[in-house]
């Protein structure tokens, strides 16, 4: 009986030691993993949803506190026709205006500094609010088709115009970020409205007669129907210039995959 009791005590002791060692190892592994994560203060991200808009969008984020981070975003779109041009067309309630600008092309780049506050337990995870500033520069190419009738004479022609428009906006982004694996993260920009101002100009060189100048001058008044921006046009014998100014509004949204290091 004594031998059985001793053997039982020995087995229980070994099991207790084994459990204690396993638990200690697991705690040590978790602690090491947490220390590794705490030491990895950087995230680089690629906004894959932006591809649908013919745009390449990247962001670098760095932790600066338990629930806070700062980031810098960069966006670039090569010059091309406007994405979802049918939607853009529906915003212009005038067929003649659309015919004049349907060959419009644009490219752009933007830089976006941002501050994030995570409302959960730690930085890089959970829901967040992020005030931001965005500077954008749009490169515009506009082959402008125009026509005008004077008595029995109809003037039809085209002038190729190009130039740049710069915008500066501020806004607030609401989003959420999840840890998918040890170093891979998913960042969802849920909604980021922003508002500010725009300014710039486009111009084209072309020798114009008095009739052609008048025809182009009248046709350019159609640009008053463009959404968001105000336009002012100048026409002379050497060509035309259009100045853009006024308010500018935008909306940030996206889905990014990130790597933490």
Regions found by a protein language model. Name each.
Residues 65-67, 77, 120-124, 179-181:
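Outer-membrane beta-barrel channels and translocator barrels
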Residues 121-141:
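Ordered, amphipathic secondary-structure segments that act as subunit-interaction surfaces
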Residues 43-45, 69-71, 128-130, 185-187, ...:
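Residue-level detector of the transmembrane beta-barrel scaffold of outer-membrane proteins
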Residues 38-56, 69-77:
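Transmembrane beta-strand segments that form the barrel wall of outer-membrane beta-barrel proteins
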Residues 71, 75, 96-107, 114, ...:
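Short N-terminal edge-element motif at the start of the domain
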Residues 35, 45-49, 79-110, 136-167, ...:
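Extracellular/periplasm-exposed beta-strand and loop segments of Gram-negative cell-envelope proteins
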């Amino acid at each position: 009986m004594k031998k059985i009791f001793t053997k039982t005590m020995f087995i229980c002791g070994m099991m207790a030691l084994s459990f204690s060692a396993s638990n200690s190892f697991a705690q040590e592994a978790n602690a090491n993993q947490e220390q590794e994560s705490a030491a990895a203060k950087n995230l680089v991200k690629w906004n894959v949803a932006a591809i649908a808009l013919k745009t390449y969008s990247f962001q670098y984020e760095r932790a600066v506190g338990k629930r806070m981070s700062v980031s810098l975003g960069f966006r670039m779109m090569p010059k091309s026709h406007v994405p979802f041009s049918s939607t853009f067309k529906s915003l212009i309630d005038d067929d003649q205006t659309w015919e004049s600008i349907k060959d419009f092309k644009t490219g752009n780049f933007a830089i976006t500094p941002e501050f994030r506050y995570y409302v959960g337990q730690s930085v890089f995870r959970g829901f967040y609010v992020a005030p931001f500033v965005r500077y954008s520069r749009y490169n515009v190419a506009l082959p402008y088709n125009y026509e005008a009738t004077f008595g029995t004479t109809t003037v039809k022609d085209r002038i190729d115009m190009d130039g740049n428009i710069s915008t500066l906006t501020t806004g607030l982004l609401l989003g959420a970020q999840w840890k998918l694996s040890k170093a891979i993260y998913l960042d969802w920009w849920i909604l980021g409205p922003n508002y500010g101002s725009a300014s710039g100009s486009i111009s084209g060189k072309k020798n114009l007669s008095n009739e052609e100048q008048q025809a182009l001058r009248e046709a350019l008044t159609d640009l008053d129907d463009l959404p968001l921006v105000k336009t002012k046009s100048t026409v002379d014998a050497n060509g035309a210039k259009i100045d853009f100014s006024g308010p500018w509004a935008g909306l940030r949204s996206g889905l990014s995959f990130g790597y933490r290091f």
